[in-house]
Amino acid sequence: MILFITGATHTGKTRLAQKLMEKYKIPYFCQDHLKMGLIRSHYTDLTPDDDQELTDYLWPVTREMAKTAIENKQNMIIEGCYIPFDWQKDFDEEYLRNIRYICLCMSGRYIDNHFDHIRSFASCIENRLDDDYCTLQNVRNDNRMFLNGCIQNHLDYTLIDDDYESAISPLMHIL
């Protein structure tokens, strides 16, 4: 079983992946690690700010890792924001039967009411060396983009609108 966890910045993707790994003893792969490894080793001229280009660059590798794990009957959680909204087109039905998808989105109201709290969790799993881009407007825009992408592509999503833990709690039973 493959579990894709995606969503906007600061929605808790890595934290959820970590909690699921601990509960189910399933490894997780973080697309940010692949991104930074490729950037720091100069295998690409892309920068961490090149979101769409990074999706185009990282998705083929991520996709084939998922297929390989399914073929080997292995479970894996793949976490990151570089999973395209049309990801399903890249998998035959035999693969799709073995893939679950979670997209975390926060409502504008939630962001407005909890922005300081959101920022306080920014490094709860991984240390963010530079979090200057995490502004109220950027977080709102990023979440709106992910929510619209899910709606337009008929993908399920988890909307965090009131209480974070009550929105995330059901996802702990997805596998």
What is the predicted role of each segment?
Residues I5:
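Hydrophobic anchor at the beta1->P-loop junction of P-loop NTPases
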Residues I99-N143:
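A glycine- and Lys/Arg-enriched "phosphate-lid" helix/loop adjacent to the NTP-binding pocket
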Residues Q18-V61:
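Conserved substrate/cofactor phosphate-moiety recognition/catalytic segment
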Residues G12:
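Conserved glycine(s) of the Walker
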Residues R144-L175:
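NTP-dependent small-molecule kinase module
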Residues T9:
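The conserved Walker
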